[in-house]
Amino acid sequence: MSRFIQGDCVRVMATFPGNAVDFILTDPPYLVGFRDRQGRTIAGDKTDEWLQPACNEMYRVLKKDALMVSFYGWNRVDRFMAAWKNAGFSVVGHLVFTKTYTSKAAYVGYRHECAYILAKGRPALPQKPLPDVLGWKYSGNRHHPTEKPVTSLQPLIESFTHPNAIVLDPFAGSGSTCVAALQSGRRYIGIELLEQYHRAGQQRLAAVQRAMQQGAANDDWFMPEAA
């Protein structure tokens, strides 16, 4: 039942039943008016009017005793924290992703990304907890101006969910979370507002699906017959 949907995530999530997804992994707009070197921008990045409604819906559709991991803008952490807590989430962990490059330089060069681990209820502890400092491989931002690397997202999905779980990303961009879920043997629901990134995500997911099917076919081809 994996789906990659174009639309306003608040309106789309409002059509979902409550307690519908097993895990949320998302990278919402940071509320900083981002613009990259090519002039690409992020929808909703200049206003926080969507923030509380989106958090309320994420809490509602997430199953009880489950987790959400959300990236955030460090200089807008007060707004994100207030919205998460007002929605009902509790903070249970924090992740730092270390970069090997500087993405922007002001008073200091920015060489990390951060995400909070948020809980609805009392989720079970993972069997193999991840360290709270993880690596970050440059994605190239080919599909989206703030594209997150699949290699950083996939360990989170594999640690915090079981196979066939439903992973939701309401701010899916070009689908990195969905790709990570697909490669992990999980189902996904991605929601992206802008048509250009939704289209890029669809193409990307289709390519990954074809590659996985081809790999499975090759495995079958070389599989020895049972005695």
Swiss-Prot record:
Superkingdom: Bacteria
InterPro entries: DNA_methylase_N4/N6, DNA_methylase_N6_adenine_CS, RM_Methyltransferase, SAM-dependent_MTases_sf
Single GO term (MF): N-methyltransferase activity
One GO biological process term: methylation
Top EC class for this record: transferase
Name of a matching Pfam family: N6_N4_Mtase
EC number, UniProt record: 2.1.1.-
Record keywords, A-Z: Methyltransferase, Plasmid, Transferase
The keyword Repressor appears for this protein: no
PROSITE patterns in the cross-refs: N6_MTASE
Function of the molecule: A putative beta subtype methylase whose recognition site is unknown.
Family: Belongs to the N(4)/N(6)-methyltransferase family.
PANTHER family: RNA METHYLASE-RELATED, TRNA (GUANINE(10)-N2)-METHYLTRANSFERASE HOMOLOG
Protein name as catalogued: Putative methylase YubD
Organism: Escherichia coli (strain K12)
Gene: yubD
